[in-house]
């Protein structure tokens, strides 16, 4: 299955394991809560989905890569303890608490969350001395003589043997005690994540044209050659920073991240073309509603790769606007919620505006720090909360509610202006694409990416765009027509097989 489905399966299992009955006991006792084993190629986002699940379920997360540990750190250090058995004194070996189990208790203390996920990565790549410990961990949920705290779900991840020479196969006894999920790389699913985290448009545009290069793993006489989703994401970050620094990303730089020479060379060549199209087509003018007939003529006779690159360039610019508008929307919503609570506090007898607002800021800052310590905030959410706190601190200059409301109204007006500007730019995009391509495959691609980006979906849900509805309706009809034809072909094949058998 793909990583998106795997995430949902793990999330569902975690929610089921943590569900309690009317007596406050877990519906599925800890002994029957099978550890979840996520098996898949490296670099496809196994660790990232653990972070997402912990935030969405509002539980803790402790993550360890077990190959970084020795037997001593995993099960604890031995020490001699004196005990009396049958009236005689004996020296016995005890163990200190496992570093991993101690980290779980530390997380509980820091975050106040008594339930969570203990995630162990590369579990099937441990050394020979640690292998028995891992079997004990999966079978008994213990490290040494210490059990995993109640309410903490075990999730482990590993790589199939073809990706790692150090892999150790689990026996049937162990496999019969776990919930195994096999996951594969899937570009279309990764693309949704890529839009959320802001992967460079050139990377997404290239992979739309060369999906086969999204994930590659080959054995050659010179060793393994590979490309992973992690490699594309890290390369994207570098390109974005290099652009700000005015530095060049050539094939040598690309190969440092995409360790498959043919793919690295192909992407480096595409990146040069991408920048060329960016300059020659005058995207900023197109987004503003101005373009020349020569531009339309050139596109009509351009190669499919070039036409699709221009479509992706336009969407890359739109994606930035959609994300900016989304963040403005969330900022205003968050600020509005704080001001509603502030207004309610002011209605209490003896409330002093300045003191109430100061207390509100202090309370919110504590909440943010607690969520940050618990890993419950993304980087974007932290920036948004800091922005809200800064705005509340500005309100302290004139804390009377009428003054605060007047300032907030200007924020709301800016949000509306931004939404109007984004809608206007989107319409300009559609007008250009309509003039250049009409109801074509290129238009279908543009509508499809609009439907796969979380920020554009959120925008179109709140803002009516007639041209989007027009072409989206056509796209849905085409998809439905293809689905019906596929069903008819399937029925026809079944009938033909039946006739042959008769």
Predicted regions, residues:
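Alpha-helical lid/collar subdomain of P-loop NTPases
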Residues: 196-354
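Charged/polar, solvent-exposed surface patches and flexible loops
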Residues: 8, 12, 16, 55, ...
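Conformational switch/transducer regions in large eukaryotic molecular machines and scaffolds
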Residues: 35-37, 57-67, 80, 89-116, ...
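Terminal-proximal interaction/regulatory segments of ATP-powered molecular machines
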Residues: 300-502
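AAA+ P-loop NTPase catalytic core and its hallmark functional loops
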Residues: 1-212, 217-220
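General structural signal for secondary-structure boundaries
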Residues: 2-9, 36, 171, 186-189, ...
């Amino acid at each position: 299955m793909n990583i998106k489905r795997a995430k949902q399966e793990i999330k569902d299992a975690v929610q089921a394991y943590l569900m309690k009955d009317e007596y406050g006991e877990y519906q599925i006792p800890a002994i029957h809560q099978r550890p979840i084993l996520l098996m898949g190629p490296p670099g496809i986002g196994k660790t990232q989905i653990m972070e997402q699940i912990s935030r969405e379920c509002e539980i803790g997360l402790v993550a360890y890569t077990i190959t970084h540990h020795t037997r001593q750190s995993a099960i604890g250090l031995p020490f001699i303890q004196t005990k009396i058995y049958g009236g005689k004194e004996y020296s016995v070996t005890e163990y200190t608490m496992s570093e991993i189990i101690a980290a779980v208790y530390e997380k509980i203390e820091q975050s106040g969350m008594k339930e969570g996920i203990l995630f162990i990565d590369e579990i099937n790549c441990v050394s020979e001395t640690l292998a028995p410990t891992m079997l004990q961990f999966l079978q008994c949920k213990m490290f040494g003589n210490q059990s995993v705290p109640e309410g903490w779900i075990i999730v482990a991840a590993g790589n199939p043997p073809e990706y790692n020479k150090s892999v150790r196969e689990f026996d049937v006894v162990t496999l019969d005690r776990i919930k195994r999920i096999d996951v594969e790389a899937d570009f279309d699913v990764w693309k949704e994540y890529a839009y959320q985290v802001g992967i460079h448009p050139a990377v997404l545009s290239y992979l739309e044209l060369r999906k086969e290069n999204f994930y590659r793993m080959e054995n050659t006489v010179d060793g393994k050659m590979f490309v992973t989703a992690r490699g594309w994401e890290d390369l994207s970050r570098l390109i974005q920073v290099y652009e700000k620094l005015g530095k060049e990303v050539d094939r040598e730089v690309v190969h440092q991240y995409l360790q498959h020479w043919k793919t690295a060379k192909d992407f480096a060549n595409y990146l040069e073309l991408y920048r060329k199209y960016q300059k020659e087509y005058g995207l900023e003018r197109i987004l503003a509603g101005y373009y020349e007939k020569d531009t339309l003529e050139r596109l009509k006779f351009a190669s499919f790769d070039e036409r699709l690159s221009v479509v992706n360039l336009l969407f890359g610019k739109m994606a930035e606007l959609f994300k900016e508008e989304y963040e403005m929307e969330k900022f205003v919503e968050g600020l509005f919620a704080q001001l509603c609570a502030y207004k309610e506090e002011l209605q209490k007898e003896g409330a002093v505006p300045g003191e109430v607002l100061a207390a509100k800021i202090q309370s919110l800052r504590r909440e943010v720090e607690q969520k940050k310590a618990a890993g419950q905030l993304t980087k974007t959410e932290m920036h948004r909360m800091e922005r809200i706190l800064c705005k509340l601190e500005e309100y302290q200059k004139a804390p009377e509610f009428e003054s605060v409301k007047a300032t907030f109204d200007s924020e709301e007006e800016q949000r509306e202006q931004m939404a109007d500007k984004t809608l206007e730019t989107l319409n300009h995009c559609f007008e250009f694409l309509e003039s250049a391509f009409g109801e074509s495959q290129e238009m279908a691609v543009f509508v499809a990416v609009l439907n796969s980006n979380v920020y554009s979906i959120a925008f179109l849900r709140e803002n009516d765009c007639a041209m989007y509805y027009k072409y989206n309706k056509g796209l849905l009809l085409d998809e439905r027509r293809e689905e019906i034809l596929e069903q008819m072909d399937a029925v026809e094949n079944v009938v033909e097989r039946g006739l042959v058998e008769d």
